[in-house]
C-alpha cells in the first residue's frame, strides 16, 4: 500500500479483510455505540450505491469516509473518521476531498451530511471545503444531541 494515499475499498482487494477490521476498530472507538455502523457495516458496504475511501499511513488505516448516493442527484457522507493520533495532519480533508471528487464524477448535484454542532473541528473542516449549514435537526443523535444538516452543491469549487 502507498503511504498517505486515499484508496477506494474494493471487495476484490487482497487488503479488504484487514481494512474492514481496522475501519471497524476506528468506528467503535470514535462513535458512540448507538451511532456506530459496526453491526450493519457489511450491509452498508454491500449496498449498490455506496462507497468507502480510506487513507493508509504508518502501517495502518488512519481514517476513512463512507458515502452513498441514494439518487442520481444526491450523495450523503455517512461517516468521516480519523484516528486521534492522525488528526490535524490533513487526512480528514484529503478523504473528504476524494469523496467529493468521486461524487462529482457521478454528476451528483448535492452532497449532504449531518454533524454534531459540538464537534467544531469537523464543522470547520466541512465549512472550509464549502459545505453550508442548512438547518439544525433537533434530537438527531439522541434526545439531548442535535445535528447540523450541511450541504455542498456540485458547482462549488473544492
Identify the meaning behind each predicted range.
Residues 42, 118, 141:
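Positions that flank functional sites
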Amino acid at each position: 500500500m502507498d503511504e498517505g494515499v486515499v484508496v477506494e475499498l474494493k471487495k476484490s482487494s487482497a487488503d479488504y479483510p484487514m481494512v474492514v477490521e481496522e475501519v471497524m476498530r476506528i468506528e467503535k472507538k470514535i462513535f458512540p455505540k448507538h451511532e456506530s455502523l459496526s453491526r450493519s457495516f457489511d450491509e452498508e458496504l454491500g449496498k449498490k450505491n455506496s462507497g468507502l475511501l480510506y487513507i493508509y499511513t504508518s502501517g495502518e488505516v488512519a481514517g476513512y469516509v463512507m458515502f452513498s448516493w441514494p439518487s442520481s442527484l444526491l450523495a450523503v457522507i455517512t461517516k468521516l473518521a480519523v484516528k486521534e493520533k492522525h488528526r490535524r495532519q490533513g487526512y480528514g480533508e484529503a478523504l473528504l476531498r476524494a469523496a467529493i471528487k468521486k461524487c462529482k464524477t457521478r454528476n451528483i448535484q448535492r452532497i449532504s451530511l449531518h454533524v454534531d454542532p459540538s464537534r467544531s473541528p469537523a464543522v470547520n473542516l466541512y465549512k472550509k471545503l464549502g459545505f453550508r449549514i442548512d438547518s439544525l435537526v433537533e434530537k438527531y443523535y439522541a434526545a439531548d444531541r442535535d445535528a447540523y444538516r450541511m450541504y455542498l452543491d456540485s458547482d462549488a469549487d473544492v
